[in-house]
Curated annotation (Swiss-Prot):
GO terms for molecular function: structural constituent of ribosome. One of its GO terms (cellular component) is cytosolic large ribosomal subunit. Residues 1-22 are annotated as: Disordered. The keyword Ribosomal protein applies. Pfam families: Ribosomal_L27. Keywords: Ribonucleoprotein, Ribosomal protein. The lineage of its organism: Bacteria, Pseudomonadati, Pseudomonadota, Alphaproteobacteria, Hyphomicrobiales. This is Large ribosomal subunit protein bL27. SUPFAM superfamilies: Ribosomal L27 protein-like. Belongs to the bacterial ribosomal protein bL27 family.
Length: 89
């Protein structure tokens, strides 16, 4: 017979804050230079053309354009930005 009540609730009840990872701009979406495209832990997505990779593996646009995702033969998914043609004035 138990001599103490179930005391588990006081020791549990904790959780970490969500990190809001994932794709922020999807394929075909317009981005400005500096916009974050993907937040990730490690390189689930790899940087392609016209994007940069931050120290926390964040992929961001380096030029204005539209986002594209492409899976190559090596099985890796690459994120690129296709630049928009600037109108000549």
């Amino acid at each position: 017979m138990a001599h103490k009540k179930a005391g588990g609730s006081s020791r549990n009840g904790r959780d970490s804050e969500s990190k809001r990872l994932g794709v922020k701009k999807f394929g075909g979406e317009a981005v400005l230079a500096g916009n974050i495209i993907v937040r990730q832990r490690g390189t689930k997505w790899h940087p392609g053309a016209n994007v940069g990779l931050g120290k926390d593996h964040t992929i961001f646009a380096t030029v204005n354009g539209s986002v594209s995702f492409r899976t190559k033969a090596n099985g890796r998914t690459y994120v690129s930005v296709n630049p928009i043609a600037e109108a000549a004035e």
